[in-house]
């Protein structure tokens, strides 16, 4: 998943970006109490796996937190497979979620040349097509009992919280949390004070995320 708020270009080290349109990932059945929005599919993760966050660097702590909260299981063990979208697909591994849905503020890994990824622009995110998509995903989740929306990072917060106004929705517990990428966790560690380890912030991120999952308006 893209981890910067500005359109800074970064090379994808594992081949060309496919430009895969990654749909929201819902449970096959049952309630959906929370929906989680990231920024966009990452070049080595969801762009290859076609599942939000799956194989993205920031997706690892997210899926670990969901697994600890009994919100996800995997079709095969993960311990022998590299955390990478293409590798996970090749190994036949898929997540099976319950009570939670996963999506992104923008459904395609943004790129200008097929090799470098960047953050989605506000114009891209606020396009009529993209807004219709996000509203449809939210409506689907509401029909299944949605009461919590969690966004990762400032870019997704701009679309969901500001542009679509969910921050002021009385029927939704709306939360923004730091993006759990290495850069995001390093920022948390710096803000926490000198000597605080990134691994400690990863655990703290998971704790806060679990609280948000269970929150209600």
Question: Where do the model's predicted regions map?
Answer:
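Solvent-exposed amphipathic alpha-helical surface segments
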Residues: 69-73, 167, 212-216
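Short hydrophobic/aromatic-enriched beta-strand-loop microsegments
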Residues: 169-179
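A polyampholytic, Gly/Pro-enriched intrinsically disordered region
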Residues: 192-215
């Amino acid at each position: 998943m893209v981890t910067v708020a500005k359109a800074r270009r970064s090379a994808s080290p594992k081949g060309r970006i496919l430009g895969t349109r990654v749909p929201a990932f819902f449970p096959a059945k049952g309630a959906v109490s929370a929906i989680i929005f990231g920024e966009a599919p990452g070049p080595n993760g969801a762009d290859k796996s076609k599942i939000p966050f799956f194989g993205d660097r920031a997706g690892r702590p997210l899926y670990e937190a969901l697994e600890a909260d009994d919100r996800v299981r995997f079709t095969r063990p993960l311990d022998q497979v590299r955390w990478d979208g293409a590798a996970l697909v090749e190994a036949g591994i898929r997540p099976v979620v319950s009570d939670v849905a996963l999506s992104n503020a923008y459904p395609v890994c943004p790129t200008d040349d097929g090799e470098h990824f960047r953050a989605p622009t506000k114009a891209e995110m606020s396009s009529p097509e993209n807004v219709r998509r996000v509203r449809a995903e939210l409506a689907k989740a509401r029909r299944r009992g949605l009461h919590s929306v969690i966004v990762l990072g400032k870019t997704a917060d701009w679309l969901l919280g500001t542009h679509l106004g969910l921050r002021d929705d009385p029927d939704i517990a709306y939360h923004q949390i730091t993006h759990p990428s290495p850069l995001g966790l390093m920022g948390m560690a710096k803000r926490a004070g000198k000597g605080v380890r990134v691994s400690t912030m990863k655990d703290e991120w998971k704790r806060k995320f679990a609280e948000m999952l269970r929150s209600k308006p």
